[in-house]
């Protein structure tokens, strides 16, 4: 998971910097990254007011983000240097612009990691439903005349992990704000489906 987060941060920063250089974003400079960060925080405020993991997810998210920002960027003087050179002109301003965008993008990934943490129960529920559904279909096949397919079992089993990781990686890395439920609910459904297929196609007799 740590590797996925690190890769997502590096990928997101690279895409953001290329977008700034190429003029892809409607907002100038670091404005695009700041807008995405604000929008991502709004998803927590509006859609994750309750959680099975944290009693106060909104307050917890802001506390975690503030703590990380203060420890990594404020205490080291990085944030103040960027602020001081944000309108100084020349190379210093360019460095400050790209640096501030990198900070904001890193915080966006952190917010999304927190959102993923809040959606862990969703993936657990999808996995449980998938296992139960698969076991029921396996028993029907076991006591009936159903045929086994090692091909389906091995391919479904092999895809389960990559689909889970790839879904997280894409969600963490997209350079624009996306509704978490729009993306993560289908991912959880696909994850549960693969588990169901894997469990249901497991050989009838051990």
Description of each model-found segment:
Residues 1-10, 182:
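Alpha-helical transmembrane segments and their helix-start/interface "positive-inside/aromatic belt" motifs
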Residues 60-120:
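Individual transmembrane alpha-helix segments
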Residues 132-188, 193-206:
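Hydrophobic alpha-helical transmembrane segments and adjacent short intramembrane/lumenal linkers
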Residues 3-7, 99-138, 187, 191:
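Hydrophobic alpha-helical transmembrane segments of integral membrane proteins
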């Amino acid at each position: 998971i740590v590797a996925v987060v690190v890769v997502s941060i590096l990928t997101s920063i690279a895409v953001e910097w290329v977008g700034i250089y190429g003029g892809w974003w409607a907002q100038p400079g670091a404005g695009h990254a700041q807008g995405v960060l604000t929008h991502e925080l709004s998803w927590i405020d509006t859609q994750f007011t309750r959680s099975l993991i944290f009693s106060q997810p909104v307050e917890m998210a802001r506390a975690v983000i503030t703590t990380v920002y203060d420890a990594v960027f404020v205490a080291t003087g990085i944030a103040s240097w960027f602020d001081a050179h944000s309108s100084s002109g020349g190379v210093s301003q360019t460095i400050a612009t790209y640096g501030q965008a990198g900070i904001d993008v890193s915080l966006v990934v952190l917010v999304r990691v927190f959102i993923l943490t809040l959606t862990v129960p969703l993936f657990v529920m999808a996995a449980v439903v998938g296992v139960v559904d698969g076991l029921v279909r396996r028993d029907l096949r076991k006591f009936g005349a159903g045929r086994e397919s090692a091909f389906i079992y091995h391919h479904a089993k092999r895809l389960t992990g990559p689909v889970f990781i790839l879904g997280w990686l894409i969600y963490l890395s997209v350079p624009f704000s996306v509704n978490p439920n729009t993306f993560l609910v289908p991912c959880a459904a696909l994850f549960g489906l693969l588990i169901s297929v894997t469990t249901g196609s497991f050989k009838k007799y051990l």
